[in-house]
Structure formats: structure tokens, C-alpha cells
């Protein structure tokens, strides 16, 4: 099966890099699925979104992302997020607590919702 190079990077660190067969992400234009050979595109990631990567060996990598961009060429996908957390590293109970206690803090709510969704999709 055809493969592409994918990098998932947050401002403070690289979360994952490798070969993949599929990337799906939530953008401001809607959800996008990218396979090898996709037309070039640049998309803006939603606040509190989820990115899912199917690796070349069939593993599924899921991350909560908060803002940033998705850049696609025929052979590469780069996800540059303002902040991101792999689903396996998320404390879902802490995220739910933030949702319960955040009041009017819309940014905290968006980040917490993205974290909960990432764990649910993993």
C-alpha cells in the first residue's frame, strides 16, 4: 500500500513522525481525510480538534490538537499545532474536571473537549 511521511508537531515538541497511509483532521472547513498522492492543501485546524493517523503498520495514533495548520503535499503531511497531546498521554478525568470547572473560559473548554474526544476516538 502507498505511504506518505507524516509529522505531528506542537510548538513545544514533536509528538510523532513516520510513515502513514491515512491522516484525518478537523479543519475550519470541515473534516479532511488525506491519503498518499492527495492534492496539495493548506488547512487551519480547529480549536479543540482531533487528528488521527493510521501508520504504515496499521497502528492508530490519535491526538488532541488546539489550533494550528495542516500542510499536505503529494508525499508529506505536516500537522503544526499550537498545542497537542497524544490520546495515550491524556488524563481524561482531569480533562472532564476542567470542563466542569472552567466556567466562561472558552479556550480551556475547547482544549478539554478536544482531549476527551481524542481519548474517545483512540
Curated annotation (Swiss-Prot):
Location relative to the cell: Cell membrane
Domain of life the protein comes from: Bacteria
Any GO MF annotation of the entry: ATP binding
Keywords annotated in UniProt: ATP synthesis, Cell membrane, CF(1), Hydrogen ion transport, Ion transport, Membrane, Transport
Membrane topology label: Peripheral membrane protein
Pfam families, per database record: ATP-synt_DE_N (PF02823)
InterPro entries attached to this UniProt entry: ATP_synth_F1_dsu/esu (IPR001469), ATP_synth_F1_dsu/esu_N (IPR020546), ATPsynth_dsu/esu_N (IPR036771)
Description of how the protein assembles with itself and partners: F-type ATPases have 2 components, CF(1) - the catalytic core - and CF(0) - the membrane proton channel. CF(1) has five subunits: alpha(3), beta(3), gamma(1), delta(1), epsilon(1). CF(0) has three main subunits: a, b and c.
PANTHER family: ATP SYNTHASE DELTA/EPSILON CHAIN, ATP SYNTHASE EPSILON CHAIN, CHLOROPLASTIC
Protein name: ATP synthase epsilon chain
Biological source species: Rhodococcus opacus (strain B4)
